[in-house]
Amino acid sequence: MGSPMASLVATLLVLTISLTFVSQSTANYFYSSPPPPVKHYTPPVKHYSPPPVYHSPPPPKKHYEYKSPPPPVKHYSPPPVYHSPPPPKKHYVYKSPPPPVKHYSPPPVYHSPPPPKKHYVYKSPPPPVKHYSPPPVYHSPPPPKKHYVYKSPPPPVKHYSPPPVYHSPPPPKKHYVYKSPPPPVKHYSPPPVYHSPPPPKKHYVYKSPPPPVKHYSPPPVYHSPPPPKKHYVYKSPPPPVKHYSPPPVYHSPPPPKKHYVYKSPPPPVKHYSPPPVYHSPPPPKKHYVYKSPPPPVKHYSPPPVYHSPPPPKKHYVYKSPPPPVKHYSPPPVYHSPPPPKKHYVYKSPPPPVKHYSPPPVYHSPPPPKKHYVYKSPPPPVKHYSPPPVYHSPPPPKEKYVYKSPPPPPVHHYSPPHHPYLYKSPPPPYHY
């Protein structure tokens, strides 16, 4: 009997344990009940993966703006179009994207479950873990949502993919230096004849080598820079080397400075006449300004009449211009469109027109030019989209880029070079 009783007790214990486990499992299921929704929410995540599509709506907004401007554009020529867009920028009409945020309303729900997880997930993680084996993948996307920007940056990266190609050019510079030295070696075959100067070497072995530099017309540039390295001149020369392909001759004179060889350099000075031509490249930088002004000038040749509309923005100036309008029998056609925009101006201007004569028109346009000439340049800036290509190489120069900017200074240093030559002669005189 003892054995049957023991077996019964054992079975009862097993049943109780199983029931407790069942209750616990049910309890766990109660906690895991939220996860199921998570599974349902996972699909939304997949749908959210293409949020970029939501970014596309903004363009339509642009169309929205274009819908209103078109009418004026016809009557107001192109200028009105440019003026109308600016205001929207100030108002940040693009802030309307919030509507898409409404579409993101579900994500908040997705975020709400996590908190509970923090409170109870730790207690019953083991069971959920099994069901959440795939969720981990879904948890990774949420972080991007927090950064939100993380999703948008990738596209720019794609556009920046080409710049890396420009990073490769810098290396060529290093090769450029290697290419130039070899030739010098060949030219150094005759230098033996110049070994006669060795006596000077006793005074300045480093200074005497320069004489051979004459035959070493191009190399001198590379040898002379090394000393400057102490003064950091080396950092700035590298960049110039490209544009200063001829300047090497310019550097050759310095060596002569040390001795009476300076008298012979004068002839090279004549050869330096061309270097100024190389200084002309810098002007391209001036193009920076040159590019922006020209466009305005071309487009503004006829605008004089169009400039009169700008005053309307001042409200008060607009009332005074109308007078000239009468004198400008033909222009009235152009002025009539702008007034409609303001409505109010169109009603009161006529009277003043008679008293304001035409001069006011001329005075009103000038100011607009100042205000709009600067606004119009921005388009040219678009043409400057390529310049970024030049900026991409600089990064590689980072090691020396910070001092490579001196390229422009180099142009300024061109004159200093002459002083440098004059400074070197004095020593000989002292000797």
From Swiss-Prot:
What happens biologically when this protein's gene is inactivated, per the record? Embryo lethality. Germination-defective agravitropic seedlings with severely defective root, shoot, and hypocotyl and a vitreous appearance throughout. Defective Cell Walls.
One GO term of the biological process aspect = plant-type cell wall organization
Tell me, using the record's free text, what induces this protein: By wounding, water and cold stresses; in response to plant hormones 2,4-D, BAP, GA3, and ABA treatment; in response to L-Ser, Hyp and L-Pro treatment. Slightly repressed by salt stress.
Annotated region (Isodityrosine cross-linking), positions in chain: 64-67, 92-95, 120-123, 148-151, 176-179, 204-207, 232-235, 260-263, 288-291, 316-319, 344-347, 372-375, 400-403, 420-423
Q: PANTHER family, from UniProt?
A: EXTENSIN-1-RELATED, PROLINE-RICH EXTENSIN-LIKE
Q: Which UniProt keywords apply?
A: Cell wall, Cell wall biogenesis/degradation, Glycoprotein, Hydroxylation, Repeat, Secreted, Signal
Give the protein family. Belongs to the extensin family.
Gene from which this protein is expressed: EXT3
Q: Where is the signal peptide?
A: 1-27
The keyword Glycoprotein is annotated on this UniProt entry:
yes
Modification after translation (UniProt): The proline residues of the Ser-Pro(3) repeats are hydroxylated and then O-glycosylated (arabinosylation) by HPAT1, HPAT2 and HPAT3. Around 20% of Hyp units are in the nonglycosylated form. The Ser residues are O-galactosylated. The lack of Ser-O-galactosylation does not affect Hyp-O-arabinosylation, but both types of O-glycosylation are central for the functionality of the protein. Correct Hyp-O-arabinosylation appears to be responsible for generating a bend on the EXT3 backbone around a YVY motif, which may represent a better scenario for Tyr intramolecular cross-links (isodityrosine type).
Stretch list, region 13 X 9 AA repeats of S-P-P-P-P-V-K-H-Y: 33-384
Per the UniProt entry, what species is this protein from, by scientific name? Arabidopsis thaliana
sequence repeats (start-end): 33-41, 49-55, 56-63, 68-76, 77-83, 84-91, 96-104, 105-111, 112-119, 124-132, 133-139, 140-147, 152-160, 161-167, 168-175, 180-188, 189-195, 196-203, 208-216, 217-223, 224-231, 236-244, 245-251, 252-259, 264-272, 273-279, 280-287, 292-300, 301-307, 308-315, 320-328, 329-335, 336-343, 348-356, 357-363, 364-371, 376-384, 385-391
Give the coiled coil ranges. none
The tissues where this chain's protein is expressed are given as: Predominantly expressed in the roots.
Q: Name one GO cellular component term.
A: primary cell wall
What is the designated name of this protein? Extensin-3
Q: Which domain of life is it from?
A: Eukaryota
Q: Where in the cell is it found?
A: Secreted, Primary cell wall
Compositionally biased, Pro residues: which spans?
A: 49-59, 68-87, 96-115, 124-143, 152-171, 180-199, 208-227, 236-255, 264-283, 292-311, 320-339, 348-367, 376-395
